[in-house]
């Protein structure tokens, strides 16, 4: 029995990055051998075990063979006869197909270290094209390692295009797709993930609503970058620079989907794109079974981001409706994330990255002004039910009128 450290742990050590998760592969052992040594079985599709002391995962060396469509369409074979090289060749990229023994000796049959030094993401074998999930994984690695100057090998990008055109991406489950998408959006440069999907043809298969934004012009006076797709990439980039959570990044990606529906005759204006885009945002949310918090914020940002930009122009009554829509009294954090998404939208324009966004503080102040209105005096006056709700709304409106008069010249 030989045990090797494999995959990301080896890659990240060679890159000089912190190693967080360690994967182990065991060569020359059977399930019975592992059980005798106290390892606990946890794998369902193939033999994976937990170490009796560290709880780290140890997998028996295995081969795989394509047997159907999609990510799950594989037959796995694990036995003591499977070699380390056979196990490594089934992996996606050469930089992930290296192994180290207990003495730190490197096994690198597919030149992963050479590609790591050359900053190239390259597939290990033609079997890469058998697993559609690898399109998303490579795009995610491109986003993660963009700061190191990594690029995708042309032949690998070709296989990604082949997979995108095959229709197999549609066989991916919502859960698997969302897991990759959400992880990619939280990388340091998530816009690279979307750009790669666009370049290889996967974006039009997975999110045609986002793909449709590329080539759609916007008014140059407000959007020097002009292209809506380029704008969305910039907004997403800003959301990562400012280290916003997944909810904000997802909303940034989807906020302008309505512009993809604007008739060409109306370009570059996009009247009412906030409302026309809502059904598209809803469709994308449902397609990937997106978590509720991400769904809600994406819809709210899609509907109200123009309100955010025009905050200082809004009538107090419209401002109150905006606050009510966000349930700002009970869910202040959601409104704060809305403000963040609006600010990223404003900064995601060429030349506007460092511009101030006074709307942010104005909206925060408005929310605070409305929150300071107490219901207790109204209860003491005997208001109940609908009358109480109406009276509370009127008091908040008064507070917002005062707030606007004090803050807008």
UniProtKB/Swiss-Prot annotation:
GO biological process, alphabetically ordered? RNA repair; tRNA 3'-terminal CCA addition
What residues bind CTP, as annotated?
8, 11, 91, 137, 140
Q: Is this entry keyworded Translocase?
A: no
One Pfam family linked to the record:
HD
Q: Which reaction does it catalyse?
A: a tRNA precursor + 2 CTP + ATP = a tRNA with a 3' CCA end + 3 diphosphate; a tRNA with a 3' CCA end + 2 CTP + ATP = a tRNA with a 3' CCACCA end + 3 diphosphate
Q: Which residues bind Mg(2+)?
A: 21, 23
The enzyme's E.C. designation: 2.7.7.72, 3.1.3.-, 3.1.4.-
User: What GO molecular function terms would the record report?
Assistant: ATP binding; CCA tRNA nucleotidyltransferase activity; cyclic-nucleotide phosphodiesterase activity; magnesium ion binding; phosphatase activity; tRNA binding
This protein's cofactor list reads: Mg(2+); Ni(2+)
Q: Which UniProt keywords apply?
A: ATP-binding, Hydrolase, Magnesium, Metal-binding, Multifunctional enzyme, Nickel, Nucleotide-binding, Nucleotidyltransferase, RNA repair, RNA-binding, Transferase, tRNA processing
Q: How does it assemble?
A: Monomer. Can also form homodimers and oligomers.
Record-given protein name: Multifunctional CCA protein
């Amino acid at each position: 029995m030989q045990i090797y450290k494999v995959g990301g742990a080896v890659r990240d050590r060679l890159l000089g990055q912190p190693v967080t998760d360690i994967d182990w592969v065991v060569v020359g052992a059977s399930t019975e051998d592992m059980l005798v040594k106290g390892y606990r079985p946890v794998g369902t599709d193939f033999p994976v075990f937990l170490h009796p002391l560290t709880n780290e995962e140890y997998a028996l060396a295995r081969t795989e063979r394509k047997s159907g469509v999609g990510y799950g369409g594989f037959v796995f074979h694990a036995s003591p006869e499977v070699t380390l090289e056979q196990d490594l060749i089934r992996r996606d990229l050469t930089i992930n197909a290296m192994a180290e023994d207990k003495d730190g000796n490197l096994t690198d049959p597919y030149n992963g270290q050479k590609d790591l030094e050359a900053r190239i993401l390259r597939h290990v074998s033609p079997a890469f094209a058998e697993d559609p999930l690898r399109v998303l994984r490579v795009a995610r690695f491109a986003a993660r390692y963009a700061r190191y100057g990594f690029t995708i090998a042309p032949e690998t990008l070709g296989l990604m295009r082949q997979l995108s055109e095959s229709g197999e991406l549609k066989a991916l489950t919502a859960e698997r797709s969302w897991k990759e998408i959400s992880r990619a959006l939280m990388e340091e440069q998530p816009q690279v993930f979307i750009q790669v999907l666009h370049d290889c043809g996967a974006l039009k298969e997975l999110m045609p609503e986002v793909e449709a934004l590329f080539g759609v012009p916007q008014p140059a006076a407000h959007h020097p970058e002009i292209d809506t797709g380029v704008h969305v990439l910039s907004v997403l980039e800003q959301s990562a620079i400012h280290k916003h959570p997944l909810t904000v990044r997802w909303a940034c990606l989807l906020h302008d989907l309505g512009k993809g529906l604007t008739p060409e005759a109306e370009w570059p204006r996009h009247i009412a794109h906030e409302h026309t885009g809502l059904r598209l945002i809803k469709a994308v949310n449902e397609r990937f079974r997106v978590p509720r918090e991400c769904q809600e914020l994406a819809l709210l940002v899609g509907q109200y981001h123009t309100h955010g930009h025009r905050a200082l122009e809004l009538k107090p009554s419209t401002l109150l409706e905006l606050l009510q829509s966000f349930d700002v009294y009970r869910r202040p954090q959601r409104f704060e994330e809305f403000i963040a998404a609006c600010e990223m939208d404003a900064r995601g324009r060429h030349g506007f990255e460092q511009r101030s966004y006074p709307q942010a503080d104005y909206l925060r102040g408005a929310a605070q002004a409305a929150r300071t209105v107490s219901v207790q005096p109204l209860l003491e006056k005997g208001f109940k039910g609908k009358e109480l709700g109406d009276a509370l709304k009127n008091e908040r409106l008064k507070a917002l009128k005062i707030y606007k008069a004090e803050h807008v010249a």
